Amino acid sequence: MTSVTLRNVCKAYGDNLISKNVDLEIAEGEFVVFVGPSGCGKSTLLRCIAGLEDITSGDLYFGKERMNDVPPSDRGVGMVFQSYALYPHLNLFDNMSFGMKLAKADKSEIKKRVNNAADILQLGHLLERQPKSLSGGQRQRVAIGRTIVSQPNVFLLDEPLSNLDAALRVQMRIEIAKLHKQLGCTMIYVTHDQVEAMTMAEKIVVLDGGYVSQVGKPLELYHYPQNRFVAGFIGSPKMNFMSVFIEQVEDERVMVQTADGKAFWIPVDGTTVTKGDRMSLGIRPEHLVSAEEGDTSIEGTVQVVEKLGYETQVYIHLDHVDADFIYRRPDTLQVEAGDSFKVGIPAHRCHLFHSDGRACRRLYQEAGI
């Protein structure tokens, strides 16, 4: 295993710049997830690390060795793709050992590595089978096993769970997380699914339009997003937003006024805020409370109620707010579409964003950070 460093890395196709000035440090043995919407450049960046795409400018290092001009086959990387890429006419043993056989490795070493990988992935009893007899989850484990057999310095996984159904995705992400702990290797995982990112990563890299929007631990990004994009992307359901007017400003708190004239203090860094500004207030659906518990409250008309048994999600239409406000609470809630509904906003759970998307630093200390 090795560390991976990107310094001012750019990737362009003609005049179209995809990856833009990416600076990133990935420690040896770290599990890092690249996450972002479609077209943000996450897979392109992974392919640049693998050597499948040339870097237009900037530097890529594995440890202290510059890798820009090193061929993919000499980089010591192993890739797992969304497509399993298994040979249908070969059994599992031959699929997993194919690369080693091409390299003319010793037969005893091949057998040792394949059996070891099969034991780790619980595939030992299936090695004589062909891929067509396996489930989607088993096929993906074979693809991962093939990478383990090659003993790479860096594992690169490009949306490996996208072809699986919801239940299998949950199972496989647990297995991949266990695999990382078992092998202790450097892993870089690409996904558009922020739930996968939050549950698997030691560190998340959020990409937006080719730029790195924020890097941090999952709970850091959840509780302390540095901009509105990260705030809206991380978390499901996504964060609620509403426009507010700045009434008063102090160094460690800001008084905001909502569209219905209610004013309250928010504990955020006020040194970059100006009285009279229009800003955006954010609050997560799960952080809304009953009207009586909040520092202020909002009232609207219920549009949709999603009753999931273990929780209820209420979509509330508010005047002067573009999108429905979402209120999320555990268990069940007796409310129906068309009802008038009031919820409370706890000031210490609020986020405040400038018009350009920059976040004001929250001063409330969340547990576990």
Curated annotation (Swiss-Prot):
Keywords: ATP-binding, Cell inner membrane, Cell membrane, Membrane, Nucleotide-binding, Sugar transport, Translocase, Transport. It is found in: Cell inner membrane. SUPFAM superfamilies: MOP-like, P-loop containing nucleoside triphosphate hydrolases. GO terms for cellular component: ATP-binding cassette (ABC) transporter complex, substrate-binding subunit-containing; maltose transport complex. The keyword Mitochondrion does not apply. It catalyses: D-maltose(out) + ATP + H2O = D-maltose(in) + ADP + phosphate + H(+). Residues 4-234 form the ABC transporter domain. Its EC number is 7.5.2.1. ATP binds at G36, P37, S38, G39, C40, G41, K42, S43. InterPro entries: AAA+_ATPase, ABC_transporter-like_ATP-bd, ABC_transporter-like_CS, ABC_transpr_MalK-like, ABC_transpr_MalK/UgpC-like, Mo/tungstate-bd_C_term_dom, NA-bd_OB-fold, P-loop_NTPase. It comes from the Bacteria. Pfam families: ABC_tran, TOBE_2. It is a peripheral membrane protein. One of its GO terms (molecular function) is ABC-type maltose transporter activity. Part of the ABC transporter complex MalEFGK involved in maltose/maltodextrin import. Responsible for energy coupling to the transport system. The complex is composed of two ATP-binding proteins (MalK), two transmembrane proteins (MalG and MalK) and a solute-binding protein (MalE). PANTHER family: MALTODEXTRIN IMPORT ATP-BINDING PROTEIN MSMX, MALTOSE_MALTODEXTRIN IMPORT ATP-BINDING PROTEIN MALK. Belongs to the ABC transporter superfamily. Maltooligosaccharide importer (TC 3.A.1.1.1) family. This is Maltose/maltodextrin import ATP-binding protein MalK. It comes from Photobacterium profundum (strain SS9). The gene is malK.
